Amino acid sequence: MKQYDYLVVGAGLFGAVFARQAADAGKKVLVIDKRDHIAGNVYTEQVEGIHVHRYGAHIFHTNNKTVWDYITRFAEFNRFTNSPVANYKGELYSLPFNMYTFNKIWGVVTPEEAAAKIEEQRQEAGITEPHNLEEQAISLVGKDIYEKLIKGYTQKQWGRPCTELPAFIIKRLPVRLTFDNNYFNALYQGIPVGGYTQMVANLLDGIEVQLGVDYLADKEKLAATAERVV
Protein backbone atom coordinates (compact mmCIF):
# COMPACT_ATOMS: atom_id res chain seq x y z
CA MET A 1 0.00 0.00 0.00
CA LYS A 2 1.30 3.43 -0.94
CA GLN A 3 2.12 5.92 1.81
CA TYR A 4 0.19 8.80 0.21
CA ASP A 5 -2.83 9.20 -2.03
CA TYR A 6 -1.21 12.13 -3.83
CA LEU A 7 2.32 13.37 -4.29
CA VAL A 8 2.09 17.01 -5.35
CA VAL A 9 5.20 18.32 -7.09
CA GLY A 10 5.50 22.04 -6.50
CA ALA A 11 4.30 24.16 -3.59
CA GLY A 12 3.08 27.06 -5.71
CA LEU A 13 -0.52 28.19 -6.09
CA PHE A 14 -1.68 25.22 -8.14
CA GLY A 15 0.02 22.67 -5.92
CA ALA A 16 -1.22 24.31 -2.72
CA VAL A 17 -4.82 24.58 -3.91
CA PHE A 18 -4.86 20.99 -5.18
CA ALA A 19 -3.35 19.74 -1.93
CA ARG A 20 -5.91 21.67 0.10
CA GLN A 21 -8.82 20.28 -1.89
CA ALA A 22 -7.47 16.74 -1.71
CA ALA A 23 -6.82 16.96 2.03
CA ASP A 24 -10.29 18.36 2.64
CA ALA A 25 -11.65 15.38 0.72
CA GLY A 26 -9.92 13.05 3.18
CA LYS A 27 -6.89 12.20 1.06
CA LYS A 28 -3.35 11.89 2.40
CA VAL A 29 -1.08 14.31 0.58
CA LEU A 30 2.64 15.03 0.41
CA VAL A 31 3.78 18.27 -1.23
CA ILE A 32 7.40 18.60 -2.35
CA ASP A 33 9.32 21.49 -3.86
CA LYS A 34 12.94 21.72 -4.99
CA ARG A 35 13.19 25.28 -3.70
CA ASP A 36 13.79 26.12 -0.05
CA HIS A 37 10.44 27.87 0.29
CA ILE A 38 6.75 27.43 -0.48
CA ALA A 39 4.60 29.66 -2.73
CA GLY A 40 6.54 29.17 -5.97
CA ASN A 41 6.90 32.31 -8.06
CA VAL A 42 4.48 34.30 -5.87
CA TYR A 43 6.84 33.88 -2.90
CA THR A 44 7.05 37.00 -0.74
CA GLU A 45 9.52 37.75 2.03
CA GLN A 46 9.67 40.51 4.61
CA VAL A 47 12.46 43.03 4.18
CA GLU A 48 12.42 45.77 6.82
CA GLY A 49 8.68 45.38 7.26
CA ILE A 50 7.89 45.33 3.53
CA HIS A 51 6.53 42.29 1.68
CA VAL A 52 8.95 41.90 -1.22
CA HIS A 53 7.88 39.80 -4.23
CA ARG A 54 11.13 37.95 -4.95
CA TYR A 55 10.18 36.85 -8.45
CA GLY A 56 8.36 39.99 -9.56
CA ALA A 57 5.13 41.63 -8.49
CA HIS A 58 1.95 39.56 -8.57
CA ILE A 59 -1.49 41.15 -8.31
CA PHE A 60 -4.39 38.77 -7.81
CA HIS A 61 -7.33 39.55 -10.09
CA THR A 62 -10.45 37.68 -11.18
CA ASN A 63 -14.05 38.22 -12.20
CA ASN A 64 -15.05 34.85 -10.80
CA LYS A 65 -16.85 35.23 -7.45
CA THR A 66 -16.38 31.53 -6.66
CA VAL A 67 -12.61 31.90 -7.03
CA TRP A 68 -12.62 35.09 -4.95
CA ASP A 69 -14.72 33.57 -2.18
CA TYR A 70 -12.40 30.56 -2.10
CA ILE A 71 -9.08 32.40 -1.93
CA THR A 72 -10.30 34.92 0.65
CA ARG A 73 -10.79 32.01 3.04
CA PHE A 74 -7.01 31.89 3.31
CA ALA A 75 -6.03 35.56 3.20
CA GLU A 76 -7.35 39.05 3.65
CA PHE A 77 -6.73 41.13 0.54
CA ASN A 78 -6.09 44.84 0.29
CA ARG A 79 -7.74 46.82 -2.51
CA PHE A 80 -4.57 47.46 -4.46
CA THR A 81 -5.30 48.74 -7.96
CA ASN A 82 -2.45 48.65 -10.45
CA SER A 83 -2.32 52.05 -12.19
CA PRO A 84 1.15 52.38 -13.74
CA VAL A 85 2.59 55.69 -14.91
CA ALA A 86 5.26 56.09 -17.59
CA ASN A 87 7.86 58.87 -17.37
CA TYR A 88 9.00 59.99 -20.82
CA LYS A 89 11.43 62.92 -20.84
CA GLY A 90 9.90 64.36 -17.67
CA GLU A 91 6.31 63.96 -18.84
CA LEU A 92 4.01 61.50 -17.06
CA TYR A 93 1.61 59.30 -19.03
CA SER A 94 -1.12 56.98 -17.75
CA LEU A 95 -0.92 53.24 -18.36
CA PRO A 96 -2.58 51.17 -19.59
CA PHE A 97 -3.27 53.31 -22.63
CA ASN A 98 -6.61 55.00 -22.08
CA MET A 99 -8.34 58.34 -22.58
CA TYR A 100 -6.03 60.03 -20.05
CA THR A 101 -3.08 58.97 -22.22
CA PHE A 102 -4.72 60.03 -25.47
CA ASN A 103 -5.78 63.37 -23.99
CA LYS A 104 -2.24 64.08 -22.76
CA ILE A 105 -0.66 63.33 -26.14
CA TRP A 106 -3.28 64.53 -28.62
CA GLY A 107 -5.63 66.73 -26.61
CA VAL A 108 -8.62 64.59 -27.59
CA VAL A 109 -11.52 64.34 -25.14
CA THR A 110 -13.85 61.73 -26.62
CA PRO A 111 -13.39 58.06 -27.55
CA GLU A 112 -14.41 58.87 -31.11
CA GLU A 113 -11.63 61.45 -31.44
CA ALA A 114 -9.05 59.05 -30.03
CA ALA A 115 -10.14 56.19 -32.29
CA ALA A 116 -10.03 58.50 -35.31
CA LYS A 117 -6.50 59.63 -34.44
CA ILE A 118 -5.28 56.05 -34.08
CA GLU A 119 -6.88 55.08 -37.39
CA GLU A 120 -5.36 58.12 -39.10
CA GLN A 121 -1.87 57.17 -37.95
CA ARG A 122 -2.41 53.52 -38.88
CA GLN A 123 -3.37 54.52 -42.41
CA GLU A 124 -0.45 56.94 -42.67
CA ALA A 125 1.85 54.02 -41.83
CA GLY A 126 0.19 51.94 -44.57
CA ILE A 127 -0.62 49.05 -42.24
CA THR A 128 -3.35 46.62 -43.27
CA GLU A 129 -2.17 43.41 -41.61
CA PRO A 130 0.49 43.82 -38.88
CA HIS A 131 3.54 41.62 -39.51
CA ASN A 132 5.71 42.65 -36.57
CA LEU A 133 5.50 44.29 -33.17
CA GLU A 134 6.00 47.81 -34.51
CA GLU A 135 3.12 47.50 -36.96
CA GLN A 136 0.91 45.87 -34.34
CA ALA A 137 1.61 48.65 -31.83
CA ILE A 138 0.88 51.41 -34.33
CA SER A 139 -2.37 49.64 -35.26
CA LEU A 140 -3.38 49.54 -31.60
CA VAL A 141 -2.39 53.00 -30.34
CA GLY A 142 -0.94 55.03 -33.20
CA LYS A 143 2.59 56.09 -34.09
CA ASP A 144 2.98 58.88 -31.50
CA ILE A 145 2.36 56.61 -28.52
CA TYR A 146 4.42 53.83 -30.08
CA GLU A 147 7.42 56.14 -30.51
CA LYS A 148 7.16 57.64 -27.01
CA LEU A 149 6.01 54.82 -24.77
CA ILE A 150 6.55 51.48 -26.51
CA LYS A 151 9.49 51.43 -28.90
CA GLY A 152 12.45 52.22 -26.63
CA TYR A 153 11.20 50.22 -23.67
CA THR A 154 10.39 47.16 -25.78
CA GLN A 155 13.68 47.17 -27.68
CA LYS A 156 15.57 47.44 -24.41
CA GLN A 157 13.55 44.60 -22.92
CA TRP A 158 14.04 42.20 -25.84
CA GLY A 159 17.40 43.42 -27.14
CA ARG A 160 16.08 43.52 -30.70
CA PRO A 161 14.39 46.10 -32.97
CA CYS A 162 10.60 46.07 -32.78
CA THR A 163 10.50 45.35 -36.51
CA GLU A 164 12.16 42.00 -35.78
CA LEU A 165 9.77 41.01 -33.00
CA PRO A 166 6.51 39.10 -33.67
CA ALA A 167 3.22 40.98 -33.53
CA PHE A 168 1.62 38.62 -31.01
CA ILE A 169 3.87 39.86 -28.19
CA ILE A 170 1.88 43.06 -27.89
CA LYS A 171 -1.59 41.87 -28.87
CA ARG A 172 -2.64 41.51 -25.23
CA LEU A 173 -1.71 45.13 -24.48
CA PRO A 174 -4.68 46.76 -22.72
CA VAL A 175 -6.10 49.71 -24.69
CA ARG A 176 -9.19 51.47 -23.39
CA LEU A 177 -11.24 54.25 -24.92
CA THR A 178 -12.39 55.25 -21.44
CA PHE A 179 -10.94 57.36 -18.63
CA ASP A 180 -9.80 54.31 -16.65
CA ASN A 181 -6.28 53.85 -15.23
CA ASN A 182 -7.01 50.38 -13.82
CA TYR A 183 -4.57 47.95 -15.48
CA PHE A 184 -6.77 44.93 -14.82
CA ASN A 185 -10.36 44.98 -15.94
CA ALA A 186 -11.43 42.65 -13.12
CA LEU A 187 -14.11 42.95 -10.45
CA TYR A 188 -11.96 41.45 -7.69
CA GLN A 189 -8.30 42.37 -7.29
CA GLY A 190 -5.66 43.00 -4.67
CA ILE A 191 -2.64 41.63 -2.83
CA PRO A 192 -2.77 39.46 0.32
CA VAL A 193 -2.29 41.70 3.36
CA GLY A 194 0.11 39.21 4.96
CA GLY A 195 1.90 38.41 1.71
CA TYR A 196 1.49 35.47 -0.66
CA THR A 197 3.76 33.20 1.37
CA GLN A 198 1.44 33.38 4.36
CA MET A 199 -1.58 32.78 2.14
CA VAL A 200 0.02 29.62 0.69
CA ALA A 201 1.04 28.53 4.19
CA ASN A 202 -2.63 28.81 5.19
CA LEU A 203 -3.62 26.71 2.18
CA LEU A 204 -1.09 24.06 3.21
CA ASP A 205 -2.02 24.07 6.89
CA GLY A 206 -2.00 20.50 8.23
CA ILE A 207 -0.50 19.09 5.02
CA GLU A 208 2.96 17.50 4.93
CA VAL A 209 5.44 19.60 2.97
CA GLN A 210 9.06 18.74 2.16
CA LEU A 211 11.29 21.47 0.73
CA GLY A 212 14.60 21.10 -1.10
CA VAL A 213 13.35 17.93 -2.78
CA ASP A 214 13.90 17.68 -6.54
CA TYR A 215 11.36 15.28 -8.03
CA LEU A 216 13.30 14.80 -11.26
CA ALA A 217 16.47 13.90 -9.36
CA ASP A 218 14.81 10.86 -7.73
CA LYS A 219 11.67 10.38 -9.78
CA GLU A 220 11.09 6.64 -9.41
CA LYS A 221 11.58 6.56 -5.65
CA LEU A 222 9.34 9.56 -5.02
CA ALA A 223 6.62 8.42 -7.41
CA ALA A 224 6.51 5.06 -5.63
CA THR A 225 5.35 6.74 -2.41
CA ALA A 226 1.94 7.79 -3.76
CA GLU A 227 -0.98 6.42 -5.72
CA ARG A 228 -0.87 9.43 -8.03
CA VAL A 229 1.63 12.17 -8.83
CA VAL A 230 0.32 15.64 -9.57
What do the PLM-derived regions correspond to, one by one?
Residues Y4, G26, I207, A226-E227:
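Short, well-ordered alpha-helix to beta-strand connector turns
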Residues Y4-V31:
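N-terminal Rossmann-like FAD-binding beta1-loop-alpha1 element of flavoenzymes
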Residues A23-E48:
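Glycine-rich FAD pyrophosphate-binding loop
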Residues E48-E124:
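Dinucleotide-binding Rossmann-like beta1-alpha1 core, especially the glycine-rich loop
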